[in-house]
A protein has these predicted regions:
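Structured aminoacyl-transfer and RNA-binding surfaces used for tRNA recognition/handling
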Residues: 1-181, 197-235
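Long, charged amphipathic helices and adjacent flexible linkers at domain junctions
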Residues: 190-194
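A short alpha-helix capping/helix-loop junction motif
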Residues: 184-185
């Protein structure tokens, strides 16, 4: 294993055989198959060499073993569930999303996708804000803004037309505060940031819909059926 320059060396992965019920049934199914039977839960790197960035290697004076385990993957194995979204601490967040949206897990594939997106994104957003990141139009803040807006859009797909993500923060905090105590300390702040961003996005959507309605009426009056590139860009930029 190596990443550009610096310490590197041989690596090994530890897989867990989840059993035939997660397999593809093919005779050659083994570690590395695309099915869900064999799950990588641990990675081990034996750091023995130093790469100077030009593929010249020298032996490290101080060798070490660098290891990393997927905590939620281990939970999937220990709880014998289908995916990380079925792990108890994550499913409790999804249940809160269901309570707020009226959509329940297992009803349909499309609804399940939306529930998973909202669950995943609100977890990520809660931790990001706790670590000091705020929604913005560039860098890390832009990633946070995209996560919140995508989650809000999936809320709309489930019939929610008002801010609701901020109401899930308490559940995210409850499920993680034993390991991350600062979540509870900053909960009020996190909730306020998310609600403010949701309200801002709602105003943006409303304004964009008004502009779209005006454009549509103008095109229909002229008998036009195609939006110009300039109009499309204006809608995108709005």
């Amino acid at each position: 294993w190596e990443h550009g320059s610096g310490p590197c060396g041989p690596c090994s992965e530890i897989y867990y055989d989840r059993g035939e019920k997660y397999g593809c049934g093919k005779p050659g199914c083994t570690v590395g198959c695309d099915c869900d039977r064999y799950m990588e839960v641990w990675n081990v790197v034996f750091s023995q060499f130093d790469n100077d960035g030009h593929d010249h290697y020298t032996e490290l004076k101080q060798k070490n073993i660098d290891t990393g385990m997927g905590l939620e993957r281990l939970a999937v194995v220990c709880q014998d569930v289908d995916s990380l979204f079925d792990v108890d601490t994550v499913m409790n967040i999804t249940n809160k999303v269901s309570q707020l949206t009226g959509a329940f897990y297992g009803q349909s594939l499309k609804r399940d996708v939306s529930l998973r997106v909202i669950t995943d994104h609100i977890r990520a957003a809660t931790f990001m804000i706790c670590d000091g990141i705020l929604p913005s139009n560039e860098g890390r803040g832009y990633v946070l803004r995209r996560l919140l807006r995508r989650a809000a859009r999936h809320g709309k797909l489930l019939g929610v037309n008002e801010p609701f993500l901020y109401r899930i923060v308490d559940t995210v905090v409850h499920e993680n505060e034993c390991q991350y105590g600062d979540l509870r300390e900053k909960q009020t702040y996190i909730t306020k940031v998310i609600r403010t961003e949701e309200e801002s996005f709602a105003r943006t959507i409303d304004g964009g819909m008004r502009i779209f309605a005006e454009m549509l009426a103008e095109h229909q009056a002229k008998g036009e059926t195609v939006f110009s590139g300039a109009d499309a860009f204006k809608l995108y930029d709005t």
